[in-house]
């Protein structure tokens, strides 16, 4: 009899068996485990397994039903379990397909749970936060899952990651993206789930929080800190590699996992239409309306600041001469003053006067933890001032700060890709594959995507001519001269330009500013 342990180690198998039963399969769980084991990773392998399973069934005198439920039939039986969306023409919103046809996705807040039908199906239902030890060989040791003893997000019990169960995808993100918990003809496992030898991982890990470089020099994923800026792409990569040589910063493989899950769940290419993200928080020259001496606090008009916001104080604009990148911790009413409040913040005490100005920069990490649903933003999903969470990942793909992607770059307008995390660099084309078949357009609103068939997870803008409310609904910047690094998603001042498909390919490797950051990429 087949080993049914797959049902305790592979969440996708649980879903596949339940769905197959719902569609008429009458075999046992052990028989179905054999079918999945024989199914293989592509149609050719499935066909071979099918013949073997049918022959075995005949020899054993099993019922015609069991014989029909061969490897290929098993894949067909779960065919209705893909979740997809189809886009046609210029509207950013699409039509849900497959088992998601009647699904609803309404993000929640800190007071409303919204409605999200994807919470009940894999792979979304299997995503969970965990505290993890990052091993030098690239593997991950889970110390505690959220809700278990020992789970804490300050880094004292390891990095905070999101575990994602193995799933499969098909279609281009801008045309007909589909997600399935089980292998199906025409589907592939995302690059993030493939080992260097081609075998599959049963799970992968994403950072739960935007990247922050700690006192140890390493790039972290923890709550309650200011995500790092003002570093070059090489400096961020060096900080990630302190964990081990195969660690890096965000890649197209990380993007692929999140993008397929997000676009299918949202049902639109205009991700900001569902959750705006931190794209309109930025403000300078906020007046200091009262003086304070030697306090870790500042007095401002009511409504200007909230706990979790990152601020600096100086003489105006982005000056930080008084206080640098502090996190607002509390807002207190001032007795007898209905117009102003006292905002306390982290760090040492300072002296502020009414000659000073506050720079409201972005949100600190962990500021979406108050959301009571799997996806949503505290207070508002539409005001552009609050962090959002998507199945445990905070501010993924867009908003707050640009994110570097390190596995591809432009050289004189042509994309080059590297599949070896130990060889990312921006000084030459060595160890990179030239994607000469991808012709990139000039600057403009992105309309659609293209990919090299060898690297289908890397999908880049093909045409421009859209708008902020049509097609991909994100902007595309490019400089076709010299070597250009990849920035994705936009920052807290980019407004409607921001989004998962918002790319900036204009900067060289020496670029750095507070708006640029990087997330940790975990190989194991």
Model-identified regions with their sequence ranges:
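Short, low-complexity N-terminal tether/leader segments at secretion or assembly junctions of large
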Residues: 1-77
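Acidic glycine-/aspartate-rich tracts in secreted/extracellular proteins
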Residues: 25, 167-169, 211-213, 317-318, ...
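N-terminal module-boundary/linker segments of secreted carbohydrate-active enzymes
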Residues: 76-186
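C-terminal, surface-exposed recognition/capping segments
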Residues: 81-90, 260, 401-409, 430-524
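Short aromatic-cysteine micro-motif
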Residues: 155-158, 187-320, 330-397
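Short catalytic/ligand-binding loop motif for oxyanion handling, primarily in non-cytosolic enzymes
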Residues: 171-172, 214, 256-259, 411-414
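Short, Lys/Arg- and Gly-enriched loop/turn segments at beta-strand edges
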Residues: 317-329, 410-416
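Compact beta-rich and alpha/beta scaffold cores in large eukaryotic transport/transcription complexes
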Residues: 334-346, 406-437
């Amino acid at each position: 009899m087949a080993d049914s342990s797959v049902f305790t180690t592979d969440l996708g198998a649980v879903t596949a068996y339940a769905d197959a039963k719902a569609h008429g399969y009458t075999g046992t769980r052990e028989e179905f485990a054999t079918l999945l084991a024989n199914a293989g990773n592509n149609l050719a392998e499935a066909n071979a397994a099918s013949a073997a399973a049918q022959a075995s069934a005949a020899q054993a005198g099993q019922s015609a039903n069991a014989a029909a439920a061969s490897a290929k039939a098993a894949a067909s039986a779960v065919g209705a379990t893909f979740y997809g969306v189809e886009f046609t023409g210029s509207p950013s919103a699409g039509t849900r397909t497959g088992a998601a046809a009647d699904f609803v996705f309404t993000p929640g807040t800190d007071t409303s749970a919204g409605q999200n039908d994807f919470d009940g199906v894999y792979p979304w239902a299997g995503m969970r936060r965990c505290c993890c030890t990052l091993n030098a060989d690239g593997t991950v040791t889970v110390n505690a899952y959220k809700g278990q003893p020992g789970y804490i997000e300050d880094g004292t019990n390891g990095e905070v990651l999101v575990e994602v169960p193995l799933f499969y995808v098909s279609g281009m993100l801008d045309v007909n993206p589909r997600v399935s918990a089980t292998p199906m003809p025409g589907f592939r496992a995302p690059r993030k789930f493939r080992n260097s030898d081609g075998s599959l991982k049963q799970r992968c890990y994403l950072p739960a929080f935007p990247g922050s470089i700690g006192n140890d020099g390493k790039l972290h994923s923890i709550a309650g800190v200011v995500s790092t800026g003002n570093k070059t792409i090489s400096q961020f990569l060096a900080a990630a590699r302190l964990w081990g040589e195969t660690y890096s910063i965000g890649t197209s493989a990380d993007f692929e996992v999140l993008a397929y899950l997000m676009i299918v769940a949202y049902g639109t290419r205009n991700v900001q239409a569902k959750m705006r993200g931190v794209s309109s928080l930025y403000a300078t020259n906020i007046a200091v309306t009262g003086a304070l001496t030697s306090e870790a606090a500042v007095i401002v008009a009511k409504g200007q600041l909230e706990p979790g916001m990152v601020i600096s104080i100086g003489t105006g604009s982005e000056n930080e001469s008084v206080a640098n990148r502090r996190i607002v911790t509390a807002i207190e009413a001032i007795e007898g003053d209905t117009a102003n409040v006292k905002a306390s913040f982290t760090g040492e005490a300072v002296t502020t006067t009414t000659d000073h100005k506050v720079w409201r920069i972005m949100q600190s990490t962990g500021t979406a933890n108050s959301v009571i649903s799997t996806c949503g933003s505290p207070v508002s999903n539409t005001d552009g001032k609050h962090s959002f969470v998507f199945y445990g990942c905070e501010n993924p793909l867009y908003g707050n700060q640009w994110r570097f992607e390190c596995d591809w770059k432009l050289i004189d307008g042509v994309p080059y890709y590297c599949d070896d995390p130990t060889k990312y660099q921006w000084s030459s084309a060595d160890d990179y594959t030239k994607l000469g078949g991808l012709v990139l357009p000039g600057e403009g609103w992105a309309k659609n995507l293209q990919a090299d068939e060898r690297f289908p997870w890397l999908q880049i803008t093909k045409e421009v001519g859209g708008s902020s409310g049509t097609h991909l609904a994100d902007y595309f910047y490019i400089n076709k001269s010299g070597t250009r690094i990849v920035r994705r998603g936009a920052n807290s001042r980019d407004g409607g330009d921001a989004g998962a498909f918002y790319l900036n390919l204009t900067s060289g490797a020496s670029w750095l500013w507070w708006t640029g950051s990087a997330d940790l990429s975990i190989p194991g």
